[in-house]
């Protein structure tokens, strides 16, 4: 269990958040095409997991835009933007914004992923959604960088995540 804050109010997050050196085991999410998507779909690539509560909030949307911009410059790296949003909402947002360099994936069918990644908000107004986090994986899903953002209304440290690639 971890603690983060939402507008200064402490909330509990369930699961064990991966640390540098840990290996993240594969998990299943849903793509914009409503197809099961796993880390194995990106085998041989480094992966940035941009995890957030909902693409329809300002800070979450900003993180998707910023990682989309950086993804175009990254060789052999897939950026997965992971939230509980329905794939339709994710696709609508990326289509309207012209974002083509990131992969949006939804946990709406498999919320066990939240606990597996240590980002499952279990109390407060956002219970059932994910905490804001960034996890960078190498080609073998070993963690190169991990940040559980301490305040949900705060952006992640993009520079720190990108520096390990």
From Swiss-Prot:
Which NCBIfam families does UniProt cross-reference here? Answer: PRK00522.1
Q: Which family does it belong to?
A: Belongs to the peroxiredoxin family. Tpx subfamily.
Q: What protein does this entry describe?
A: Thiol peroxidase
Q: Which reaction does it catalyse?
A: a hydroperoxide + [thioredoxin]-dithiol = an alcohol + [thioredoxin]-disulfide + H2O
Task: Note the subunit structure.
Answer: Homodimer.
Q: Which domain of life is it from?
A: Bacteria
Signal sequence extent: none
Give the CDD domains listed for this entry.
Answer: PRX_Atyp2cys
Name any one GO molecular function: thioredoxin peroxidase activity
What are the alphabetically sorted keywords of the record? Antioxidant, Disulfide bond, Oxidoreductase, Peroxidase, Redox-active center
Its annotated function is as follows: Thiol-specific peroxidase that catalyzes the reduction of hydrogen peroxide and organic hydroperoxides to water and alcohols, respectively. Plays a role in cell protection against oxidative stress by detoxifying peroxides.
Name the EC number(s): 1.11.1.24
Question: What positions does UniProt annotate as the active site of this protein?
Answer: 60 (cysteine sulfenic acid (-soh) intermediate)
Thioredoxin domain residues: 18-165
Instruction: Enumerate the Pfam families for this protein.
Output: Redoxin
| Note, other | The active site is a conserved redox-active cysteine residue, the peroxidatic cysteine (C(P)), which makes the nucleophilic attack on the peroxide substrate. The peroxide oxidizes the C(P)-SH to cysteine sulfenic acid (C(P)-SOH), which then reacts with another cysteine residue, the resolving cysteine (C(R)), to form a disulfide bridge. The disulfide is subsequently reduced by an appropriate electron donor to complete the catalytic cycle. In this atypical 2-Cys peroxiredoxin, C(R) is present in the same subunit to form an intramolecular disulfide.
InterPro entries linked: Redoxin (IPR013740), Thioredoxin-like_sf (IPR036249), Thioredoxin_domain (IPR013766), TPX (IPR002065), Tpx_CS (IPR018219), Tpx_Peroxidase_subfamily (IPR050455)
Q: Provide the disulphide bond pattern.
A: 60-94
Q: Which gene encodes it?
A: tpx
Lineage of origin:
Bacteria, Pseudomonadati, Pseudomonadota, Gammaproteobacteria, Pasteurellales
